[in-house]
Amino acid sequence: MIVAVIPARGGSKRIPRKNIKEFCGKPMIAWSIEAAKASGCFDRIVVSTDDEEIAEVARSWGAWVPFMRPRELSDDYTGTLPVIRNAVDWINQNDSQVKYACCLYATAPFVSPEDLQRGYSLLKQESASFAFSVTNYAFPIQRAIRITESGRVAMFNPQHFNSRSQDLEEAWHDAGQFYWGTKEAWLKEQTLFNERAVAVKLPRHRVQDIDTHEDWVRAEWMFRAMKSKE
């Protein structure tokens, strides 16, 4: 069985009810559910939540919510791995054996069905443990600066002060959208970022952090602009 697991707890602090707040005409989580359905990759689209209202909204958009997430996995400090591990364990014990699982964030409206398909293909082709979305930094991280306690400026890597941008290695970061993995990887690995993982590259304009009200407004502008060109 191939499953998508969408983590969506109810206790978001900076943007209350973030996972079901309306984003460009739909509850935020609906965009992830619809992308998963349109990809054709999944036998089940599961939402892991501790919140009855989120569960109801998720079901209304076609997701499966067969259990409520335990309280101990629903606080501000629980990471992605134990949440997906819990869902995979539950499905293995109560439904069918999972072969591949994809963690798809509820707050990833920019994810496309094609992105999910590419991730699945890469996972299998490369015999990888994980395949997850990344995008590149807009500026060379080797030339990053910090502000000291006295308010002065210092480079993290002073040896690159005179380096040309085109001579520096390109750096990438987690795009925070989706993470494909084998059942074994989800159940046994301690980190997603290891030598057994492969990257699914996304363009920067489709990678938007949505953590504040300003982020939300900017993301809606970008989303509408992107959709108007399709």
Model-derived features: positions:
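Short aromatic-hydrophobic micro-motifs that form the base-stacking/packing surface
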Residues: 102-104
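N-terminal glycine-rich phosphate-binding loop and ensuing alpha1 helix
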Residues: 1-48
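Short, high-confidence coil segments that cap the C-terminus of an alpha-helix
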Residues: 42, 96-98, 127-128
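Short, structured coil segments at secondary-structure junctions
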Residues: 41, 61-63, 149
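Conserved core of the sugar-phosphate nucleotidyltransferase
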Residues: 79-82, 109-196, 201
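Hydrophobic helical membrane-anchoring modules
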Residues: 199-201, 206-230
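Short phosphate-binding loop-to-helix
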Residues: 53-100, 111-114, 118
